[in-house]
């Protein structure tokens, strides 16, 4: 999931 990446550009963050 993108939220678990160092750089997040998703709505979930």
Swiss-Prot record:
Membrane-spanning segments: none
Primary localization class, coarse: secreted
Tissue specificity of this protein: Expressed by the venom duct.
Keyword Disulfide bond appears in the UniProt entry: yes
Residue pairs linked by disulfide bridges in the UniProt entry: 2-12, 3-10, 8-13
Any one GO molecular-function label of the UniProt entry: toxin activity
Gene Ontology cellular-component terms listed: extracellular region
Compartments where found: Secreted
Swiss-Prot/TrEMBL keywords: Disulfide bond, Hydroxylation, Secreted, Toxin
Location of 4-hydroxyproline modifications: 11
Domain notes: The cysteine framework is III (CC-C-C-CC).
Family (UniProt): Belongs to the conotoxin M superfamily.
Protein name (record): Conotoxin Reg12g
Source species of the chain: Conus regius
């Amino acid at each position: 999931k993108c939220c678990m990446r160092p750089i997040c550009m998703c709505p979930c963050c």
